[in-house]
Structure formats: C-alpha cells, structure tokens
C-alpha cells in the first residue's frame, strides 16, 4: 500500500500479503457455538398455534426471568410453532428447559420438534407415564416413526434440560439433564431423511412449560471435511465364517456456510495428504463461479505444510462448497463386523421349516480406538423377491417438495390402510409435489411397477394420478391418468418435472372405485403403461420408446389430489431384492437381543396375499459398542416354506438387512494438513508531518470487513521508502531505499471480530523528502470460525448383508458319525443316517467309510437290518493313512427325521426315517484315532455337497459330542437398520 501525499487514507480490499493458515493440530479447537435462534419468552412474539393446539406466554413457571411458554388445550400433534428466521441445515443442536407440573391435565408426553415448512422433521419425546425418552420423525406434523427409545424417569414439578443434536453424518442424539446439571440419560439414532428446517414446534400433551429455547450451529462457518462412505457387503455362511466385500470412497468437502456476500473467501488452498487411494481426485461438485484445480504444490506465500495434493479454489462465495472424491483401497476398513450361526444350515423344500439365527455385531478393535463409541442400528427384512407395500405399516415414506402423502384408513384395497396423496392448495400441492420411498438398491431397466389407485369423485385438487420410478435426482418415468380430459399417457421426469413422451390414449378412468395399473420399463427402450378395471379386464394401454434413464432407486407419487394408492409393487428382472419368489411363506416368529430393543413388524419385501399381514422384519436399535462392550447378539427364529420340486439343492435368498452405524473416525491416514485463504478486509496507513521540519508520523489500521469471520492479526509491518528512489526500483522490499527509523514490526496476536477495526500506535521518523509509507500483514482465521472434520457418513453409505439358506428338493439325507471310546481301548462306531426332508428317498442310498491303518473291524450290524440291501469293502493300497474302504447300500428312507443324530431314536428307526450302522474298531501297534473322523455319502442319492456329513466323538452320550463338518454350507446373511415403533400419537 502506498501513499504519496500526507494525511491521505486509501482503502484496499483483498490485497496485501495475507497468511491464512489452518493447521491440522488445531482440529477440534472450537470455542463456543453460534446461536441461530433463542427465545427466553420475556417478550412474546412470532409464536403461532398449530392445528388445534395452543401456546401462550405464561408467568406460572419460569426457569429464568418472569415468563415461559405454556403448551395447552389439545394433545399431540397440536401445539404451536415459531419460525427460525431462515432455513437451516444439519450440524445443529436444539436445547432448552422443560417443566411438567402435577397433576397432569391430559397427555403426559413432552414433545418438541425442529421441522420444515410442511412440518416434516424430528422431535424429542419425554414420556412421564412410561418413563422413557425417544427420538421420532414427523410427517405433516404427525409422529410416524420412533427411531430409538430408552428408559428415564423424568422429573415433575421441577425443571429439566435437554440437548438434541442433529449431525450431517446422519446421527441424532438426545441428552437430558436434571436441574442440578447431572446427566439423566442419552440416546442416539441414525436417520438421513430430513436435512432442512425452518421452525421450532412444540407438540405433545398438556400442560407443560418451555423456557430458554435455543438453536445453535455446532460448527463454525468454514468447514473442511474429509468423509468416508462405505459400500460393503457381508457374506455369512452360518458356521461362524464371514466374508466381506468392500467399497470405500473418500470425499473432501470445502464449504463456506457463512450467509453474507462479505464472507466470500478468495485464493483458497487446501493441503491434503491422501493415503491408501485407489484413484486420483475426481471433482464431484463445484458451487463456485470459477474453476477449481488440483496442484502438486502450493505457492510459498501460503506457508502450507507438505502434502501430496493441493486443491486450489480461486473464489469460494458464501453458501457454496466444492467436493472432490477418490476411491480407497478398502481392505480392513469396517469398524463394525458381523458373525452369524444357524442351528441348521439347510432345510427341506415344500414344508414348513424353522431355523434359529444367532447374529452377532461386534467392534473391530483394529480400527476403533479405545474410548470411542460406535452406535449401531440394524434392520432385517425377509424377502421373496420384490418390493411390496400394502401400507398396513407406515414406514419410509418422505414428502417431495411441497407434496403431502400420508397414511390413511379412508380407503383401502386390501387390509385397513392405504397411501393418501393429499393437498390443500392447487398452487402448492399439485404435480410435481408428492412423496417417495427409497428402494434397498439402485435397479436398472426391465422393471415393472404396479398397484391399485382409487380416485374419489369429489377429488377437488389436480385431476391427474401420476406414479413412477426415479433416481436420486428425481429423473425417471411416470404414468399419467387424467380424470378431467379422460386419457392415459407416459411422462419422462427430469428433476421431478414431467414431459409427456407418448401419445394420449383415450380412457375414462373410474372414480369411487379401484383400478389396477402396470408401468413396464424395458431395457430395449420400450415403455408400456396399462390399466385394468377392478374386475381384472384390460382398460387401456399406451407405449413409447425412450432410452434417457436407465437407473432408479425410488418409487415416487406425483400428480394432483386427492387419490389413494394400495398394494404397490416393484418387480425387477435384474434385481431380486435379496429374495426368491419361490418362498410361499416367511415369518419371523421371535427375536431377542442382548442389548438394545428388537421390534418385529410387517416389512416391505415379502409379498403376501391381499388382506394378510405377518411379521417379517426386525428393527434392532439402541446398540452402543465400545472396547468394554464390544459385541451385541440378536437371536431370532425364521419360519419358511420354499416351493421346489427338483432333486438338486438350491441356495435360496430369503432376506437382507442393512447396518447403519455412526463412527466419527476414519480408517485411512488421509488428512487435511492445512488451509490458506484470503477474505474481505481493509488495511490503511496514515502519515503526515508533526508540524516540525522533517518529522513524519505513521500508523496502520486493520479493518475486518467480513460479517461472519473473526481474524487473528498475528503480524503487521509498516515502513517508509524514499519516493524518488522508489521510482527507480519500483520495489518496496528493497531495503536500500528504506528510510531509517520508519520500519516497525508489530505482533498484536488478537482477534478482530467482524466489522471491527484495530489501530496501531503512531510512530515518528525523520526524513527531509516525501516518503511513501507501506504496510503488510499476516493473520489467521480465528480458531472459533473454522473446523476440520474427519467422519464416516451414513448419507450415501451402504452396508448390506444378504441372507441365503440351502433348500433341498424332495429329500435331504443327514449323516452323523459318532466315535465312542470303550474302557478296553476299543471304539464303538455309530453312523446315523436320517432323511430330514419332505419326500422319501430313492432306493439304494449309499454310505461310505474308511478304516485307518492298524485298526481291525468287528461287531458289524445295521438297525434295522431290513433296511440293508447290501454291504461290502475294498482293500486300499495307495493311501498311507487308510487300508480299508467300507460301503453300505440302504433301502429308501422315509422323510420326517428330526436330524438330532441320535442312534437310540427307536421311533424313527422303526418308522424307517433313521438307519443306524454300527461296527467296532480295535487299534493295534501305533494307531491314529483321529484318522477315523471321516464318513461319505453317495453323491447321487444323497445330494452332495449339501448334506454336511458330520462326525462326532462321544464320551458316553449323544449330547456330549465334538462335531467336525466335512462340507460347509455357504449361507449368506445380511444386516443393516432403521427403526420404527408403533407411535401412541395421543400423548
């Protein structure tokens, strides 16, 4: 900066030498939170009654001051709300004080929410009757899902305090405190549905009081995140062995969340040390008006530490972000591992079979440091190969834009409930507004969506029924049934907005009765839409060709209102929803957990006959793992009937699950090493004469022009140069032209808040000519205004476990070999052959055994002897361990054995369901009893390799045995969670 005349101040923005460095060692140095919303209710303004509820200013009770908010008149969801003043996102905390007086007036639950313009969001729930705390989701103000619940006895007739955290990685956490400040209880859940909020809503029962209600940003405005997203699959074989396939992506997000233009950052450099990467950086999103760049080094003036990659963002405006991603070598990266065993590893076809699943989730201590908690949610679905929602349970539906979809008992095609596409304003709630539900995985073409629609004749809003399949950007296809112009057609959706791509085919759709639809999207580009009357006859069909979109991950309800949808199905040729359509029945009959809460419900992936419902899914919630509590177990029973008539075995998928976890650590050594940026500031100098000859004065002023950022002024230099000499060199840093006594270095090391000014002291120097005064500065962003975050995101992450079991058609032979030592050193051998299937075996079931060297065989018999067709043996000369091969040919074995391997089961032996083969072994010289642990079954008639011959060495009883499985069945199991509870909305 330079001035040629005395007493002239010039202002320069975005100039001078600026050092703006964030070091990784400063990572969690956030001092204080920025308040977004606060109301102490001493002045009553901005509050509105919601629905039939009422809130008012009251002096009955107050935590601070004289007044508080009183919630009264009607129970949940009725209450009151106040706008925050702007739309806010996640990474916030809502906190305040609640007072519940006795006696109760009515509903006994205190419920406060943070919601959007459609009253969708989250609320806390404090139950004074059942002594619980919970986190719940809200749709149109209605509490529809209990995400998590735990025990706490809340106080009455005294204040208690709550903190409700909503994180961008999907975590929700509620903490409640007693009036003395001690922690009462805490509970966590994972949910990603809602990301924007604009109001605080007081729901619940009556009467209760709220005071000192506050919402704060958890993080300062400049946020540099390194986030890891999982895409993992666990394969569990039911014997304790688990195979993992990994996908892991690293994301670097540089976000300026400040709201004002004056908070624009310039010349942003981010130093990143990328480790274990399988690819380079890819630009995912650029929210700036200019380009962004990847460099191998940064300019010296940034003073950034060494790193292997640098991201350069020339300008980062307020409310903007830049995101890069890269692939990670994902071996050994899951903080949560899965193990599972079954009591049986295969079942017979064409009959009801029940098996017990023992599922363990446990902490990977190689990745999670001691002292860290990982919260886990698991949701388990049984599946027979398709998406199916009969709306008897309301789960997973989200509002789209200003749309309203809700659970309704007004109309139903089957059962008691359906989805209602509702509205109150044609300008707000018509197409494209509506609702959607995510599928468990992205699917491709060759897919059919079908279901039933009911349009009442007094519908009132927009006249078009529109349902489709779309992707994460709401690109896809939907149908159009027009009740006003009487036609059907097909739309292509782009960002949710429709473009008609087919002819309009005449059809006068029925009203006040149900009609059936099918929308078929083929891989060859053809799209066909057909409608059917309630009696099953074809009504109308239209086709078109369009190849624009090929992937879909959600069902979307668009169109006008009011209309109803029921028995909604999605069937895909290329994706089986982790199930098999040959399952005629699937049910979870019981579930018990060692930790947390396991709730059974009717899921979306087992298609039943209309008007039926069964429990085929589990919500397992409120699991917290750490080094001292490193595992949790869920034991559940599955009842199923698989239709299959072939002789060969089949590995049948019967369900899937998702694991959701929050872990704010990362698994690679990738890290953000530092950040440099310039912001909006002013620097100026004053200089002039003192009135004395040749005596000059100088000082410097630093002004922070930002509105959200504070700057720490660490260093400032001021000096003067000879004007005439400067014009020869044009370099103010040439010390040969500096004026003696004019050079000063100042180290204020103070924070300059937004809009504030700092002035240096005034300095004197002597010079006979005209000086030019220069100044430069170094400053860093105040520690409270930035944060660098390493975290694992649940948004975009997938941890799916797929579940399979072997099903054997017609019959299933199980062979158990028992080796029983006798007192004289000999061994009794019992080979128990059982048919645990549903059909009699063919004749000639062959059993094979090998006799180790230095053993002799005696006392051979078969029980019953009538089951023996033939037997024989062969001498072995080519095997160093065995010298004799024995075989037995048995008559057809009847079905229905219990598979317990008992050689004394008289009832099964007499019924020819079980055959027992016996012989005695006597060792001579040096012999090896371990070599006797072998048995064989004929591969044709016994369905190898799925019969799992089993050998046991027994000390006197069948129950005391040691089992070795010669053939292990691959049983693939899956995991992952959401939670839902039945909500008692009248509290």
UniProtKB/Swiss-Prot annotation:
A GO cellular component entry from the record: plasma membrane
Membrane topology: Multi-pass membrane protein
Domain of life the protein comes from: Archaea
UniProt KW keywords: Cell membrane, Membrane, Transmembrane, Transmembrane helix
Localisation per UniProt entry: Cell membrane
Main location: membrane
The UniProt record lists the keyword Transmembrane: yes
Entry protein name: Uncharacterized protein MJ1394
């Amino acid at each position: 900066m330079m001035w040629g005349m005395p007493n002239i101040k010039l202002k320069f923005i975005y100039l001078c030498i600026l050092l703006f460095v964030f070091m990784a060692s400063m990572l969690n140095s956030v001092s204080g939170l920025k308040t977004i919303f606060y109301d102490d209710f001493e002045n009553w303004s901005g509050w509105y009654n919601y629905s039939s509820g009422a809130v008012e200013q009251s002096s009955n009770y107050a935590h601070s001051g004289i007044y508080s908010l009183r919630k009264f008149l009607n129970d949940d969801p009725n209450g009151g709300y106040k706008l925050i003043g702007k739309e806010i996102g996640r990474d916030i905390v809502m906190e305040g004080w609640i007072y519940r007086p006795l006696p109760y007036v009515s509903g006994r639950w205190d419920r406060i929410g943070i919601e959007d313009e459609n009253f969708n969001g989250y609320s806390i729930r404090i139950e004074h009757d059942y002594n619980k705390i919970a986190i719940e989701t809200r749709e149109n103000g209605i509490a529809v899902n209990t995400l998590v619940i735990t025990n706490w006895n809340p106080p009455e007739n005294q204040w208690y305090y709550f903190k409700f955290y909503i994180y961008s990685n999907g975590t929700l956490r509620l903490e409640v405190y007693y009036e003395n400040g001690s922690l009462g209880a805490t509970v966590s859940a994972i949910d990603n549905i809602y990301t924007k909020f604009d109001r605080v809503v007081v729901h619940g029962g009556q009467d209760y009081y709220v005071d000192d209600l506050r919402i704060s940003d958890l993080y300062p405005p400049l946020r540099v995140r390194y986030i890891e997203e999982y895409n993992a699959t666990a394969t569990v074989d039911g014997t304790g062995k688990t195979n993992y396939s990994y996908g892991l992506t690293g994301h670097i997000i540089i976000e300026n969340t400040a709201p004002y233009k004056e908070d624009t950052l310039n010349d942003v450099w981010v130093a990143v040390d990328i480790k274990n990467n399988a690819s380079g950086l890819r630009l995912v999103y650029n929210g700036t008006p200019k380009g962004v760049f990847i460099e191998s080094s940064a300019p010296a003036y940034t003073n950034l530490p060494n790193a292997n990659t640098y991201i350069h963002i020339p300008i980062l405006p307020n409310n903007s972000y830049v995101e890069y991603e890269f692939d990670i070598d994902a071996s050994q990266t899951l903080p949560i591992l899965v193990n599972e065993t079954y009591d049986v590893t295969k079942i017979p076809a064409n009959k009801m079979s029940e098996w017990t699943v023992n599922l363990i989730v446990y902490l990977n201590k190689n990745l999670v440091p001691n002292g860290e908690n990982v919260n886990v949610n698991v949701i388990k679905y049984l599946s027979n190969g398709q998406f199916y929602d009969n709306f008897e349970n309301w789960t997973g539906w989200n509002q789209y834009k200003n749309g309203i979809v809700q659970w309704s008992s007004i109309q139903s095609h089957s059962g008691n409930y359906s989805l209602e596409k509702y509205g109150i304003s044609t300008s707000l709630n018509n197409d494209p507004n509506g609702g959607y539900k995510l599928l468990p995985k992205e699917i491709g073409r060759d897919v059919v969506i079908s279901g039933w629609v009911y349009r009442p004749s007094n519908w009132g809003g927009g006249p078009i029924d529109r349902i489709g399949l779309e992707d994460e950007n709401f690109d896809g296809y939907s149908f159009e049934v027009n009740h006003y112009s009487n036609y059907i057609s097909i739309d292509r959706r782009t960002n949710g907005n429709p473009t008609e791509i087919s002819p309009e085919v005449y059809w006068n759709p029925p009203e006040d009765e149900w009609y059936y639809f099918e929308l078929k999207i083929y891989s060859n580009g053809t799209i066909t839409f057909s409608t059917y009357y309630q009696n099953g006859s074809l009504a109308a069909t239209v086709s078109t060709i369009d190849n624009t979109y090929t992937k879909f991950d959600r069902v979307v309800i668009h169109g006008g209102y009011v209309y109803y949808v029921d028995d909604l199905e999605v069937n895909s040729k290329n994706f089986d929803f982790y199930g098999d359509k040959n399952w005629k029945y699937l049910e979870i009959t019981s579930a018990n957990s060692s930790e947390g809460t396991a709730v059974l419900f009717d899921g979306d992936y087992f298609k039943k006959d209309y008007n039926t419902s069964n429990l085929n899914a589990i919500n397992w919630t409120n699991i917290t793992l750490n080094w001292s509590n490193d595992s949790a177990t869920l034991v559940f029973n599955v009842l199923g009937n698989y239709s299959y008539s072939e002789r060969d075995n089949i590995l049948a998928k019967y369900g899937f699950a998702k694991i959701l976890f929050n872990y704010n650590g990362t698994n690679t050594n990738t890290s953000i090493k530092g950040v440099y940026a310039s912001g909006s500031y002013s620097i100026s100098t004053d200089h002039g004469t003192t009135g004395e000859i040749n005596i000059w004065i100088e000082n410097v002023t630093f002004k922070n022009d930002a509105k959200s950022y504070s700057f720490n002024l660490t260093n400032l230099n001021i000096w003067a140069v000879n004007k005439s000499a400067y014009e020869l060199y044009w370099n103010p840093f040439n010390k040969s032209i500096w004026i003696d006594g004019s050079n000063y270095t100042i180290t204020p090391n103070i924070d300059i808040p937004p809009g504030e000014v700092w002035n240096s002291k005034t300095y004197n120097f002597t010079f006979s000519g005209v000086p030019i005064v220069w100044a430069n500065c170094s400053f860093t962003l105040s520690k409270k205004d930035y944060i660098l975050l390493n975290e694992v995101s649940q948004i975009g992450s997938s941890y799916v476990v797929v579940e399979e079991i072997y099903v054997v058609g017609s019959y299933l032979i199980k062979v158990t070999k028992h080796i029983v030592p006798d007192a004289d050193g000999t061994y009794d051998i019992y080979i128990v052959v059982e048919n645990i299937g549903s059909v009699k075996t063919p004749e000639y079931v062959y059993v094979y055994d090998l006799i180790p060297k230095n053993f002799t065989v005696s006392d051979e018999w078969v029980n019953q002897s009538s089951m023996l067709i033939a037997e024989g043996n062969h001498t072995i000369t080519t095997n160093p361990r065995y010298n004799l091969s024995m075989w037995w040919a048995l008559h057809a074995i009847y079905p229905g054995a219990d598979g317990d391997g008992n050689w004394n089961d008289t009832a099964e032996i007499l019924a020819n369901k079980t055959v027992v083969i016996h012989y005695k072994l006597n060792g001579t010289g040096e012999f090896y009893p371990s070599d006797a642990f072998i048995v064989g079954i004929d591969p044709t008639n016994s369905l190898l390799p799925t019969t799992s011959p089993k050998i046991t060495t027994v000390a006197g009883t069948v129950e005391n045995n040691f089992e070795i499985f010669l053939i292990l069945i691959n049983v693939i199991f899956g995991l992952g969670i959401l939670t839902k509870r039945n909500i008692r909305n009248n509290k």
